[in-house]
Amino acid sequence: MVSMKFLSTVFAAITAANAAEILSVPNTQDVIPDSYIVVMKDEVATSDLEAHVTWVRNHHHSGHVRRNGTLTGLKTTFDISGFRGYLGAFDHDTLDEILADDKVKFVEPNRIMRIQGTQTQRGAPWGLARLSSSRPGGSDYVYDDRAGEGVIIYGVDTGIDVNHPDFEGRATWGINTIDQDNTDGNGHGTHTAGTFAGARFGVAKKATIVGVKVLDAQGSGSNSAIMEGISWSVDHARKNNALGRAVMNLSLGGSFSQAVNDAAERAVRAGVFLAVAAGNDNQDASNYSPASAPNVCTVGATDRMDVRATFSNFGSVLDIFAPGVDVESTMPGGGTQMMSGTSMAAPHIAGLGAYLMSTENLQPSQVCDRIKQLASNSVRNPGNGSTSKLANNGIGQ
């Protein structure tokens, strides 16, 4: 796989003022190793392209023989109403020479594209069905089959049963900052993970799941343990080149904490989308953390009839509402259970964030605004100062 580090190194090595550049790509997972699309400048005539192509073939052949290489070189040319160039598989030395030619406009790594269809999950949990429906009462979840592929979701919670069959082997254990028990002794974390990325219960059915345990079996944890979990998650995403393709679900909260809010803000700034529960006290969420952090996506809960749940916090810091009453999802040991809370609403948004990153190639900083754009103004009795926006994945029925 061609790494972005190599691509940037090659570009840095080209010092000529008129040298072409290798364009960066948003998802290096799809890059075909050593395969490139070379685009010529607009003013390059067909005859100049032919001369350049001949030179490339000869240069590649002589150098490749000398280096005992196996790459095929130039494969095909294209000319689409004056948009000219070629496709080939080249080693680094040949690519350097191509980039230095002033006839070349840019080079782009060749990548895989796939059919883009939608899937329909019949008899889906009501919360999922509501995400793809224009009105309450539906039973089908319609979604784009990219479904969070290539995105990591960090479940910062009570831990996750990574062996639950609904996770299909996509879940791994990350870190435990609260105790010595590397299991989900509460069930809350496994439930939220099922909602954001389970195969049956989840929004982003192809996302990678990482369990970050910051709460104990009673569902409690210190601010410092939570901050350590946030810090570890950002560092893990950075080490795995996932910043910009990472989501954090924080179905937790407490009274206002500047330190916790600042930790959440730094995670957003680093390149992680944060979905945060608004809280369950029927109070103004501006007094809660991390719900009141300015750039997280704060989530209130609704019931099956699009009414704000009686327990859901409210207020101007809420960005969006999502289903949060009687939500069925995964539980430790392989089973399922019903839970209610803004903790159940937030993972719908974490999953939707990952989903939109994969389908629309959004940056984390764009995700919450995009979710609000796609939402319907459907929430009844949203609470004083609250939005009435209810999450939708944009497919609609």
Swiss-Prot record:
InterPro entries: PCSK9_ProteinaseK-like, Peptidase_S8/S53_dom, Peptidase_S8/S53_dom_sf, Peptidase_S8_Ser-AS, Peptidase_S8_subtilisin-like, Peptidase_S8_subtilisin-rel, S8pro/Inhibitor_I9, S8pro/Inhibitor_I9_sf. GO terms for molecular function: serine-type endopeptidase activity. Its EC number is 3.4.21.-. This is Subtilisin-like protease CPC735_066880. PANTHER family: CEREVISIN-RELATED, PEPTIDASE S8. Its main location: secreted. Residues 35-115 form the Inhibitor I9 domain. Residues 125-397 form the Peptidase S8 domain. It is found in: Secreted. It holds the Pfam family Peptidase_S8. One of its GO terms (biological process) is proteolysis. The active site is at 157 (charge relay system), 188 (charge relay system), 343 (charge relay system). Belongs to the peptidase S8 family. Keywords: Glycoprotein, Hydrolase, Protease, Secreted, Serine protease, Signal, Virulence, Zymogen. It is an enzyme of class 3 (hydrolase). Glycans are attached at residues 249, 384. Residues 1-19 form the signal peptide. Residues 377-391 have a biased composition (Polar residues). GO terms for cellular component: extracellular region. SUPFAM superfamilies: Protease propeptides/inhibitors, Subtilisin-like. Secreted subtilisin-like serine protease with keratinolytic activity that contributes to pathogenicity. It comes from Coccidioides posadasii (strain C735) (Valley fever fungus). Residues 20-116 form a propeptide. The keyword Transcription does not apply.
